[in-house]
Amino acid sequence: MVDNIWSDFAWSYDAICSQLNCYRRMADKILRDTQGLAHVIDAGCGTGLVSQALVRRGARVTGFDNNPGMLAVALRKQAESPEPERARWTVLEGDVRVFPERVEGGADAVVLNNVLFYVREPEAVLRESLAHLKPGGRLISAGPRRRPDLQKVMEQSIEEWKAEGRWDEQLQKATAYHVDLTRRLVTDPNEMVTFFEPEALVAELRRLGFTRVLAADHDDYYGENYYVCMER
């Protein structure tokens, strides 16, 4: 496993991301594009935010991550879930460049949510995703188009929270901690290494063997993030 800045993120990730409207809008797209799909691989699942939402909706989910702090949160969620959900949810240690052996192929979808920006060899991850999808299976990838404008994202998020009456002491405390870590993440050239415009990612996926574009935009995180969904 890799113990890095994401171990520090583990405490605040759920507290903040689950409250960010920009994250919720992106997660809603993932739920939209996996509607009715039976088996979803959540590669680089982090704390299991997306995995848990998929499992609750009835999907069978295999999630994996290589950071001990994030993985511990996902494992705790899985263990505390009601038995029917727990039975459909597998959480593993693993690297997105070479999926764990226990990850079954023939999946209906592979989700790469805020994953590729941390990988120097994105082609390896995309090939692994392709190899684990059934014909017609979907790859969903979301992430930054460039080094993110943290100030813009947080200022607009805080304005939304205030307008909704959610900007309370607990959220302010979690935000302060999260922003400090995120600032380290976005300014360290070794932490964020790969960025995509949606059109560029679509072209790369076509080159690797994906065929049909179901979604491709750059609306998320107030224009900072791309979202792409393509069929094998």
Predicted segment positions?
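Conserved class I S-adenosyl-L-methionine
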Residues: 1-35, 49, 53, 80, 140-170, ...
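Short conserved loop adjoining the S-adenosyl-L-methionine
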Residues: 98-104
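A conserved beta-strand element that flanks and buttresses the S-adenosyl-L-methionine
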Residues: 111
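Core SAM-dependent methyltransferase catalytic element
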Residues: 208-209, 217-232
